[in-house]
């Protein structure tokens, strides 16, 4: 996961062949609710014009009482064994193609793709997020915050060709699960049912976090994603993986030594390294340590804020606590904005090692 993970027509309808509705949900009137119900029953989705001129998300409008959209996951028609096969192919490619990024491998960038494709969600109108798999479109893939993620997307394309029934939203998020688990991280509960949406449903750029801000920015940014302080600190612990790249984010360096193993090292380094604020070759300020590690200002903000600091210390002292909280928070991030059927199964995948592969 790179630094940019912190800088982080008239109403129309088309028929889906799968049991899915992309629906406008009425918030106060029975009429709007009836429209939504009929749309789902007829296997249609409704959309409204995006005349937004800022980064706060789509404007409500086309349907009188509508304030947001509903992302309905289609009912499961595959079993855990089917998705385990997809998992295994991603994991095998991860294991075999290990020279990427100076032998860091593809794990961290797969986690970053899952994070970024999910992190565009806005709780105010339920737009964005992982549901529609919209990273595959130019508008989202060329968001400056997503620089470098084309490598992860290309890595996953052969998997999509072998398993064409999986949606891009499911593929991108499952790739992140593989990245965490195969790099010795915790189990990540995962549910399928995302459905690819058309290009005009791509969220606006500017929804991903910046890396050069303070604790107030971090807290306010994550409010849009509906995360509390503990979940924020847990999610940022994914920076144990990978490194920053000047050409992608404007920052340079690894967060620690074990950058392809998922541990609580991020918190230990925050507390124990001799950090100095310095300007890098791009002219951006970052915290550097004598060991060659770096922290973004938004990383360092976690020890400048008293509430965040308590949690950093807890995770530094107890990796199991970090793993438990990260698993819950990351699974929640991947599902933000999606309504799953009550009986939708939760898949828990075995690693290649656990399968003896």
Curated annotation (Swiss-Prot):
It is an enzyme of class 1 (oxidoreductase). The keyword Calcium does not apply. It is found in: Mitochondrion matrix; Mitochondrion intermembrane space. Binds 1 heme b (iron(II)-protoporphyrin IX) group per subunit. Its cofactor is heme b. Gene3D superfamilies: 1.10.520.10, Peroxidase, domain 2. InterPro entries: Ccp1-like (IPR044831), Haem_peroxidase (IPR002016), Haem_peroxidase_sf (IPR010255), Peroxidase_I (IPR002207), Peroxidases_AS (IPR019794), Peroxidases_heam-ligand_BS (IPR019793). Pfam families: peroxidase. GO terms for biological process: cellular response to oxidative stress; hydrogen peroxide catabolic process; response to reactive oxygen species. Keywords: Heme, Iron, Metal-binding, Mitochondrion, Oxidoreductase, Peroxidase, Transit peptide. The keyword Disulfide bond does not apply. Heme b binds at residue 239. Its main location: mitochondrion. PANTHER family: CYTOCHROME C PEROXIDASE, MITOCHONDRIAL, THYLAKOID LUMENAL 29 KDA PROTEIN, CHLOROPLASTIC-RELATED. This is Cytochrome c peroxidase, mitochondrial. It comes from Candida glabrata (strain ATCC 2001 / BCRC 20586 / JCM 3761 / NBRC 0622 / NRRL Y-65 / CBS 138) (Yeast).
């Amino acid at each position: 996961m790179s630094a940019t993970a912190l800088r982080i027509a008239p109403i129309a309808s088309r028929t889906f062949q799968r049991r899915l509705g992309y629906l406008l949900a009425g918030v106060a009137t029975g009429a709007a609710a009836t429209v939504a119900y009929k749309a789902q029953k007829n296997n249609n989705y409704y959309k409204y014009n995006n005349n937004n001129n800022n980064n706060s998300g789509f404007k409500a409008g086309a349907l009188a009482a509508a304030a947001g959209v509903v992302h309905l996951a289609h009912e499961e028609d595959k079993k855990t064994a089917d998705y385990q096969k997809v998992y295994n192919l991603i994991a095998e490619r991860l294991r075999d193609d290990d020279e990427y990024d100076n032998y860091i491998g593809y794990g961290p960038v797969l986690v970053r793709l899952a994070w970024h494709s999910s992190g565009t969600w806005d709780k105010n109108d339920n737009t964005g997020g992982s549901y529609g798999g919209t990273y595959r479109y130019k508008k989202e893939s060329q968001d400056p915050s997503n620089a470098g993620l084309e490598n992860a997307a290309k890595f996953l394309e052969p998997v999509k060709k072998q398993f064409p029934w999986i949606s891009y939203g499911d593929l991108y998020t499952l790739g992140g699960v593989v990245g965490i688990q195969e790099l010795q991280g915790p189990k990540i509960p995962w549910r399928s049912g995302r459905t690819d949406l058309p290009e005009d449903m791509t969220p606006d750029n500017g929804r991903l976090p910046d890396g050069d801000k303070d604790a107030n920015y971090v807290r306010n940014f994550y409010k849009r994603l509906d995360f509390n302080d503990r979940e924020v600190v847990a999610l940022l612990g994914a920076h144990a993986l990978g490194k920053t790249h000047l050409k992608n984010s404007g920052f340079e360096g690894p967060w620690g030594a074990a950058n392809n193993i998922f541990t609580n090292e991020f918190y230990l380094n925050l507390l124990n390294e001799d950090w100095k604020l310095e300007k890098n070759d791009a002219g951006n300020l970052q915290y550097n340590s004598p060991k060659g590690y770096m922290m973004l200002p938004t990383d360092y903000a976690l020890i400048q804020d008293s509430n965040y600091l308590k949690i950093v210390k807890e995770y530094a002292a107890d990796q199991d606590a970090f793993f438990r909280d990260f698993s819950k928070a990351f699974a929640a991030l991947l599902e933000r904005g999606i309504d799953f059927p009550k009986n939708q199964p939760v898949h828990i995948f075995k690693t290649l090692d656990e399968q003896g592969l």
